[in-house]
Amino acid sequence: MWTPELAILRGFPTEAERQQWKQEGVVGSESGSFLQLLLEGNYEAIFLNSMTQNIFNSTTTAEEKIDSYLEKQVVTFLDYSTDLDTTERQQLIFLLGVSSLQLFVQSNWTGPPVDLHPQDFLSSVLFQQFSEVKGLDAFVLSLLTLDGESIYSLTSKPILLLLARIILVNVRHKLTAIQSLPWWTLRCVNIHQHLLEERSPLLFTLAENCIDQVMKLQNLFVDDSGRYLAIQFHLECAYVFLYYYEYRKAKDQLDIAKDISQLQIDLTGALGKRTRFQENYVAQLILDVRREGDVLSNCEFTPAPTPQEHLTKNLELNDDTILNDIKLADCEQFQMPDLCAEEIAIILGICTNFQKNNPVHTLTEVELLAFTSCLLSQPKFWAIQTSALILRTKLEKGSTRRVERAMRQTQALADQFEDKTTSVLERLKIFYCCQVPPHWAIQRQLASLLFELGCTSSALQIFEKLEMWEDVVICYERAGQHGKAEEILRQELEKKETPSLYCLLGDVLGDHSCYDKAWELSRYRSARAQRSKALLHLRNKEFQECVECFERSVKINPMQLGVWFSLGCAYLALEDYQGSAKAFQRCVTLEPDNAEAWNNLSTSYIRLKQKVKAFRTLQEALKCNYEHWQIWENYILTSTDVGEFSEAIKAYHRLLDLRDKYKDVQVLKILVRAVIDGMTDRSGDVATGLKGKLQELFGRVTSRVTNDGEIWRLYAHVYGNGQSEKPDENEKAFQCLSKAYKCDTQSNCWEKDITSFKEVVQRALGLAHVAIKCSKNKSSSQEAVQMLSSVRLNLRGLLSKAKQLFTDVATGEMSRELADDITAMDTLVTELQDLSNQFRNQY
């Protein structure tokens, strides 16, 4: 490995490394001068260096494409230059590639603005085909388009990213002397991805390859220096995986970084005060950070903290009630250790992962604010401070007492880009271990906040300056100025026709011809054009055309999560369940935590009669969203279908948690039959063993739903319907049947219909027989008499109603249909009376 590679990755050399370079003669070489400028953060000087000028000032034709020219010049220098040896040529080109990337990041992410122009280091012949620099930028942006996804139109100095990509990606196979190159390729890929509208499968594949290559570098992560770099690498990998929906892999990478650092990070409760006038300390949620070891004690390998005056100021809340920070009752108990850059970055990474894996909810916001409070309590690094403040402003904008600070803080974050007091070297410390958004994204956040607060004109001013026409259109549309939105887009199209502008015009007008024009302009490569056209078909319920457009879009870029989901829905509408299953399968592959996609996938499997697959997919859906009652309802039905009776009981309990009066009599019938008949479940176990759990479930159900006779009868059935050998079970069955009878007789019109009347009579007779059996096991004769008397009264009431309602007025005779029932009731009333008398004689 070339000696300075670790320092370049780290962003600074140690004193020992400086001495080693002097001894090895690194400093005096051509690459040594580049190295010194790079480590000083003087990236522009590298491009103004005579060596760089010589590489790129070769003869060319005006017709030659700029990317071809740049790559040709780099390859020519690497292969044919005789002034330097092969290794040093590779080192120079590598340093040029890293400088290009760093300068591009400075120009678009960190600031301050870059003064370098392409004309400063490239041949003037290259610019003859462009009337102005904007024309060159637009052409370069088109070269950086991938998988049909365009790049933000006002990206600054895109030529720098193009050059970085040529060196770190296209010709990386020629830089064999640089072992750490795959890591820089990964960084270049990550920066490129964040400029695209959607995730690029090409970039993700390249990122995965880079990660694998870095993992194989044995000597990169050894000794104390390697430990710090290992943490940085695993954090960078975690952010890559998070962005591409690989949440499990991201968590694994974060866990590795945390294990290396030996940090213990926990959300916990502590007594404290939040308001100025609070008298008592109450439990507050805080982040407790502790070191379990001292593995990161060698501070020469970690970046030195930036002076606070050079960091974005953490603005005060200035509220007359709420304190700026929680005032803890015992500050020393939760005293946080003095953390290094990598340790703070781990906390930020865990916070970001937590945010991605939890629903938007008040509790989640409170937990995230505990993370931001912790991060901001040790202001040391520009990238971490900026990331934490951006997250806090997003969390605070919904609070009436905090929105004013959120507004001021976002403005301060937007303004810091132009501020030249903080050097780029300070801003780039630990930069790649954080997800700092580009500076225009912060300005967009400011404009969005202004719009939400009702400052529409100020928001529009920022959006128009940023040329974020989609946001401009949304502003006008929400303000009801539909004509103005169309006017703005047509004005921009007169200046230059682009696929994205035609797509936006199509969104405003709902006109397919606009999307067709965008598709044509993109040379049939715009995933956005087909995506937008499909969505219009979807709104118009033209599902067949919708499916065709979505399929074209995902063929260009298969990483469009939202498109796969909408495609699945369109296939469901067409009743093409094979198609919907395929689409939702791709959805959950991209985002394994998408509960709705899992649920819809199970629906597709159910329609395809693949019930076991449906059951498994619903299990995955519930892992993602435990609160979604519709998923639980699908789960309970599928569980009973496939014979997972234990899971069905568990699901019924959960539905009772989520919906207080939930009932599904059909499911309860299946469960009762399974338990009583001793059916085998999917695993081959006999369901009789679930009797206790089913009784417990019925106890909960009947405590919530008290007026359903069918449920009470099923409950009695679980206890043997009064025919059990256990007296206590017969007693319980009698109680359930009594309540069922009460529900039956309280319902409307049962006595006016002879069929319904006969059903009630049969239930009353059955209840009477159970009462007779139970009475014989009563220890108290008085209780036995009460039981028999209640059922005898039921029968007498029915006899009375029968005579009243079903006697022929002309003949005075009872309906023949009830003759047997009347006889049975009369006989049973007599038997009950005799048995009651026997018990009375025992008093």
UniProtKB/Swiss-Prot annotation:
PROSITE patterns: TPR (PS50005), TPR_REGION (PS50293). It holds the Pfam family TPR_16. TPR repeats lie at residues 453-486, 492-525, 527-560, 561-594, 596-628, 629-662. It comes from the Eukaryota. Keywords: Repeat, TPR repeat. Belongs to the TTC27 family. This is Tetratricopeptide repeat protein 27.
